[in-house]
Structure formats: C-alpha cells, structure tokens
C-alpha cells in the first residue's frame, strides 16, 4: 500500500489543484487565462513524463537482443524434454557433439555459435580473481553469429587457442584504457591451472538491452568436452545463424533429425520411439529476442508486465487529454463571448479555430519539453532504480517520437470539438445571454466522468495488488530456513578439507552451525543431472551435500529416512528426492538404484532412501521441479573441492556482520588461497531480495503511476464538477431564495456523483480482477486477491470526489442569488 508520505503528498496536491482550478474561474480574465494554461500544462507534463518512463521499459523489452539478431536470422534451438508433463517442457543446453550435428544439419545454417559462461578472470594488475566480472568461453562461430565491432585489432584471429576479445568497458576496468588493454595478456581459470590469453581485439560494448551486455571478456572454447556426448555435459548454449533468405520452418526438421541421431541417453540407445519421435516433431527454433521472455533461460522480460505498463501509459495520456478536453469545455462560457466579440469586429471563424489548435500544439510541445527535462533529472536520482532501462537518448529516442506524435494528435483532437462547438453560436445570441451545452454534451460529460472513475478504481486496485503480491513472495515460506544464514564460496583451495573449515568457523562466537554442499541451495542458475532408473530417463536439479545439510535447513522428510553420518562414510551413495521428483516419475520409488552424482565424478552406485517435502530452490517465478540431494563417503578428487560452498548459521541479527568477515577467514585457511583470493559470501535474505528486485521496481513504478493517474482522474472530475456547477447556477440561486442551506446543496450536487462512482466501481471489480489475474500469471505462487483493496479503492475515490463536491458546494453557497438571477 501507499505509505503515509505518499498519502500526504496526494492530499496536498489535490488541495493545491482544487485551489488552482477555482482560481482559473474566479480571477480576472487575463490571470484566469494564465492559470488555466498552467493547469492544462501540469496535467500534460505528468502524463507525458509517466508515458515516457513506462514505455521506455516496454521498448527496452520489445527491442531486447534485436541488435544481435542479424535482422531476425539468429535463433535458439530447443528440444522437448523427455516427459511432456514437466513444468519446463523444453531444453536449450547441449553437448558439443550435439551442437556439431546442428551445425552440419543443413546448408542454410551459416553458423552455430557456442557459449559457456563458466570461468574466472584474474586481475592483471592485482592478481585477484574477478568472480564478479563475467567472462565467456565461445567458439569461432560465435564471432560470426554476433556483430563484434572492433575499436582496436581484429576478431579474425580468434581461432588461436590463446586469443581473447575484450569489450570496451571491461578494457577500461581491467587495464585503465583501451590502448593499454590491446595486446596485453590476462589469465582465465576453468580449472586449477589458468589459460594465458592475449587480447587480439577491443570491441565496442554491446547495447544495454541484450544478453551479452554484461560479458566483458571472450576466450576460445577450444576442445573443451568436444568428445563428451552424455547428458551431464549438456552445458552449452547454441545460437543458430541462418543464411539470408533461409526459412526457419524449412531448416527446423533437418536440425531436429540431426539432433535426434546424436542424442544419447547415457549408456542406453534403446530410447522409447515415442520420445525420439517427439524430439523430431516438436523441437523448435526460437527467435533470439523471444528468449528474453523465457524465465527458464533467466529471461527478465515479461509480456504480462509490458502489457500492463503499456495499458497504463496509454490510459495515462487518455486521462490527460480528457482533462484537456474538459477544461476546454469548462472555459467555453468565458472564451466564447470573447471570440464572438472578435467575430463582430471582423475576425474570421477559421482563423479563430486555427489559433486554438496552434495554442494546443504549443502547449503540447512545452509539456513534452518539461517532461524530457524531468526524465533527465530522474536519470541521475535514486528513483531511476525503478527501471531496468538506462534513461539515455539512444534508448528513449523511439519512445520520444511516439509520445510526441500521440500527444500532438490527441491534443488537436481534444480541442477541436470545443473549438467548433464554441464557434457554432451566433455572436448576437451569445452576447444577449449565457450559453448552455446540448443534451448530447451533457451525456458525453457523464460518460467521461464514468470512464475516469473506472480508471481510478482499476489503477488503485491493481497497484495495491502488486504490492500485496510482492510482500507475499518476499515473505513466502520457501520450505527451508533462510533467516540469519550466510552462504560462502570457500575458494578453490580452502574448500578441499571441509572439516578444517568447519573447525575454524565454529570458533567464531557469532557462528552457531555449519554445513557444506557443492552449490548454493537457492539458485539463480540451475544445473541439471540426467540418469536412467529402471529404464526411465530422469532429469533433475541436485546438490552433493554433507549428511547434516537437510537438518541444518530444516527440510522435512515425508517418506523414508534422512541422511545419517553413516551415509557420509559409505562408498555407495544415497539420494533423497523431493515430492515433485516422484510426481514427475511415478514409476520410481524409494529403494530404487540410481547412479551417483558426486562433485567431479559420476558412475558410482547409489540408492534413493527418502523423500523430502517440496521446497523452492528457485525464485517464485518458477514452479517446483524434480530435485535430489546426494550424500556419500566416496574419496574426493584431490585436484578439486567437493564442497566449495559452506552455509553458516549465525547468531540472530549477525548475518550481515559475519558475511563481511567470512571471506577473509576462508582465504587465510590456505597459503595458495591467500595468494589467489576468491572466497566470497552472500546473505541468504539479501539473495532472496535480489531475486525480486525487478518485481520491487515494477511495484514501485506501477504504484507511482497509479497515484499520478488517480491524481489526473480526480483533476478531470474536478473540472467536470465545476462545469456542472456553471450550468445550474440559476437553479441554485432559486433554491437559495427559497431557503436552501449548505447541506441541501451538498445533497443536490453529490447524488449523481455517488451513483456514477458506484456504477463505475461495480464495473471495475471484474475488470480489475481480470487485470490482476493476468499479471499474476508470471508467478508460480500467487497471493489471494483481498477484498479490502476494492473496498478501500471505493472509499478513497468516493471520499475524494465528495470532498471536491463539498468544496464546490461551499463556493457556490457564497454567491449572491440576486446577482446570479440578474446575470441570467
């Protein structure tokens, strides 16, 4: 919900707006004219500002990866999973032999770029490992698929095993300048021993809205896993570039057939024919841009969000233009007399109409300029964090053009009817008395008022529901303990002996418990294992853990048993799977054998011994999928750490403090680790917050937009009420002569608006629920839609409307009946 400051701001703005609107019609003609222009300008500036912000985010998503797409020729090949009822029906990670088969499947395939982002850079100046600077291993085809633009050097020599390509920003960060970077060397770690690479090219940074924007260094993939064709080596992304004029529909069957022939199910080649047939028939080529909207690929785009933001932006401008129309109509009683006098003295009707249209266009241009200035100011403030899009001219230019065009056309249309209508009166008739709008004009006003009430309700309910959902996912019980827990990567060397790490960490008085795994429990990138169990091929995410891991996190066993210390000493391994695992593979049961998954090795015997209650190991945008914990006493590979990730339970409230000193403690455990550095730590609750940082930005953006849109709607309502008051002055004067009091005038003015508000509310409830349900589709876990958001929306809109009516009633009650009747 809105905070107290926001509510206070709304109240102040409404009061000031009410006073401004009153001044527009109570002051002298010149001052009233200036005030009216300022009032119109304020509404247009607010609407234009919000339109640019919202549509900037939409345009960012709509154009994502478009600079990389080679005019629509870049695709991602996806094949269906073995089981069609899985929450994630497609896979896009492949082995090197599978990618080679795709590359040779058709002459229309120009190149298939291969990428793996596993690897760590070493700072050439300090020697520290740069885990926060993403680097990628790619093949020669990759530089053919994507448009690298060299500033220095050339990418033609990337086939060398010791070559590297560095982007401009990474070059400045690592070496201080582009010139210093070119020709220099850096170390790239994929195993214990580094690869020394020479920088053969420094290229321009890729645009901010593409998947390569955060990768700073590219090194050759070489022969890594080139001959590995079992599912545990499906670790590479494949980007397909088709030749110009080639049809994706024609190429797809050839690629699917080539992939199916090179698809290996472990040691078994007797894959059921229906599965292989589904691979041939249901594989697909997905345009690169569409991957931005796929949460399985950690895509940050959301078509639901884009639809909601687009609707809000368009309706925002609609509200502002309706306000412009209503204020123009409200000012007719003043402007038409002046225009009639001008016509009597020879002014042409067409010139008067043109003047009003040009005035409206100038007003739009001024509003557009002020809105751009506000956007520029916002770009340098903390409020810019509400958007994931950089607020610069390169990103926003298309949005500016569309906004200016829509604003100009809308503003012209908004003043045309009042201008033509005002010019339709005969000067002699106008100068003899006051004008009244036609019945159709009154019906239009009622319809406009109903529409703005409706928008107000929808905006408020939707904005509050987004806040409800964000609090729901932030506070949602993931199924395991998250409070006061740190996760640390021990480093390559310190993590080789977990018991030494345990002993040292438990000496810290702020640390109460420690456990180990090969990766974090709450994952932003999921790595899948594939096994064959009783003839059934299973695919699941998993962790290799110590026996105390499940107890540490409070994970509940619902069938079978949990791990024991004996399991951690046996040469054969043990599995505990989640409930989703058994739902996905109903033919598998406790006691069934399944090949082990010790870090750095596989092929050992293991058995499923228990089932753990389902828990969320990803953010709540993803459904719960099959997961397995593995534990064994197998000897570790001496060259690698089996459990490089340590989870630490801290004293209440100490997680952040412990996280700050934990990397230093871990780096000191080994002389090699002390030299290399690399240990790092995260607070689990902060990790959860980062998962929903995008949703939090979205929530704040929509709530601010909803607040401003409500303000615009209320200002429009204020203008309509004032117009209504102008048309019933004579009736009010007669009632006052017959003894009508202020409460009588309140009842006279408020009845119709209460009915309109209630009718709009009744219409808005199902519409709001539909919008809310549409938006909630992006979440696997959804909060219930509370009734109070609709009740408070009705109270808020109706209360503010009655407040406006009360202000107008007080104003009109102070008029002199005799003066009003004499004017009539």
Task: Describe each model-derived feature in a short phrase.
Residues 2-45, 294-298, 328-354, 358-361, ...:
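Alpha-helical transmembrane segments of integral membrane proteins
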Residues 4-10, 28-38, 68, 260-313, ...:
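Membrane-helix entry/capping segments
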Residues 53, 284-286, 360-425, 468, ...:
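Small-residue-rich transmembrane alpha-helices
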């Amino acid at each position: 919900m809105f905070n107290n400051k926001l509510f206070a701001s709304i109240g102040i703005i409404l009061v000031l707006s009410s006073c401004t609107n009153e001044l527009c019609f109570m002051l002298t003609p010149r001052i009233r004219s200036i005030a009216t222009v300022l009032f119109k300008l304020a509404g247009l500036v607010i609407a234009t500002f919000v339109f640019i912000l919202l549509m900037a985010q939409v345009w960012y998503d709509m154009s994502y990866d478009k600079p990389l797409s080679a005019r629509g020729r870049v695709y991602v090949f996806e094949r269906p999973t073995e089981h069609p009822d899985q929450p994630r029906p497609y896979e896009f990670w492949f082995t090197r032999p599978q990618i080679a088969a795709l590359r040779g499947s058709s002459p229309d395939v120009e190149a298939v770029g291969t990428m793996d982002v596993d690897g760590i850079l070493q700072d050439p100046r300090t020697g520290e490992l740069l885990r926060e600077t993403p680097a990628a291993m790619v093949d020669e085809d990759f530089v053919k698929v994507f448009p690298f633009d060299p500033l220095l050097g050339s990418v033609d020599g990337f086939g060398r095993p010791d070559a590297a390509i560095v982007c401009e920003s990474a070059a400045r960060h690592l070496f201080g300048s582009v010139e210093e970077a070119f020709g220099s060397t850096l170390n790239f770690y994929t195993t214990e021993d580094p690869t020394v690479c020479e920088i053969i090219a420094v290229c321009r940074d890729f645009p901010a809205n593409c998947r390569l924007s955060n990768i700073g260094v590219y090194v050759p993939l070489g022969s890594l896993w080139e001959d590995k064709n079992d599912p545990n080596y499906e670790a590479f992304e494949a980007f397909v570039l088709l030749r110009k004029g080639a049809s994706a529909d024609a190429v797809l069957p050839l690629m699917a057939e080539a992939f199916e022939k090179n698809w290996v199910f472990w040691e078994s080649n007797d894959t059921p024919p229906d599965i292989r047939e589904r691979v041939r028939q249901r594989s697909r080529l997905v345009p690169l841009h569409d991957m931005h909207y796929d949460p399985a690929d950690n895509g940050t785009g959301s078509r639901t969000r884009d639809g909601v933001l687009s609707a809000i932006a368009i309706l925002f401008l609609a509200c502002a233009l309706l306000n412009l129309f209503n204020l123009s109509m409200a000012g007719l009683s003043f402007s038409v007399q002046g225009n009639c006098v001008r016509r009597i003295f020879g002014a042409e009707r067409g010139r008067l109409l043109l003047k009003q249209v040009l005035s409206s266009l100038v007003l739009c241009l001024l509003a557009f300029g002020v809105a751009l200035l506000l956007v520029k100011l916002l770009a340098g403030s903390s409020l810019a964090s509400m958007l994931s899009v950089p607020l610069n001219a390169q990103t926003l230019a298309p949005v500016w053009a569309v906004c200016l065009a829509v604003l100009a056309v809308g503003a012209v249309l908004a003043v045309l009817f009042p201008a033509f209508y005002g010019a339709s009166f005969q000067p002699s008739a106008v100068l003899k008395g006051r004008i009244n709008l036609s019945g159709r004009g009154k019906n239009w006003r009622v319809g406009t008022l109903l529409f703005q009430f409706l928008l107000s309700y929808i905006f408020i309910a939707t904005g509050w529901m987004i806040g409800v959902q964000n609090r729901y996912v932030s506070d949602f019980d993931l199924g395991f303990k998250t409070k006061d827990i740190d996760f640390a990567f021990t480093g390559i060397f310190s993590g080789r002996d977990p018991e030494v790490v345990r002993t040292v960490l438990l000496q810290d008085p702020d640390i109460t418990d420690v456990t180990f795994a090969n990766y974090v429990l709450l994952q932003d990138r999921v790595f899948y294992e594939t096994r064959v169990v009783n003839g059934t091929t299973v695919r699941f995410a998993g962790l290799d853990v110590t026996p105390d891991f499940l107890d540490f996190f409070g994970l509940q066993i619902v069938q079978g048993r949990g791990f024991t210390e004996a399991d951690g000493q046996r040469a054969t391994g043990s599995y505990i799977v989640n409930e989703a695992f058994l739902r996905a593979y109903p033919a598998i049961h406790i006691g069934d054998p399944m090949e082990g998954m010790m870090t750095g090795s596989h092929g050992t015997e293991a058995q499923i011994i228990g089932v753990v209650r389902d828990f969320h190991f990803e953010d709540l945008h993803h459904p719960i999928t099959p997961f397995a914990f593995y534990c064994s006493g197998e000897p570790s590979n001496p060259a690698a750490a089996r459990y490089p990730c340590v989870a630490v339970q801290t004293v209440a409230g100490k997680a952040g403090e412990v996280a700050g000193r934990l990397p230093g403690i871990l780096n000191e455990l080994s002389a090699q680790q002390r030299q290399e550095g690399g240990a790092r730590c995260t607070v689990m609750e902060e990790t959860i917050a980062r998962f929903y940082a995008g949703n939090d930005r979205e929530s704040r953006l929509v709530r601010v937009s909803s607040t401003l849109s409500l303000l615009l709607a209320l200002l429009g309502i204020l203008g309509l009420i004032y117009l209504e008051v102008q048309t019933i002055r004579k009736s009010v004067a007669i009632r006052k002569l017959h003894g009508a009091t202020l409460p009588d005038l309140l009842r006279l003015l408020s009845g119709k608006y209460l009915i309109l508000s209630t009718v709009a509310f009744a219409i808005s409830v199902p519409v709001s629920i539909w919008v809310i349900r549409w938006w909630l589709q992006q979440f696997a876990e959804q909060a219930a839609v509370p009734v109070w958001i609709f009740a408070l929306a009705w109270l808020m809109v109706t209360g503010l409307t009655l407040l406006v009516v009360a202000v107008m009633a007080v104003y009109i009650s102070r008029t002199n009946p005799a003066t009003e009747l004499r004017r009539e």
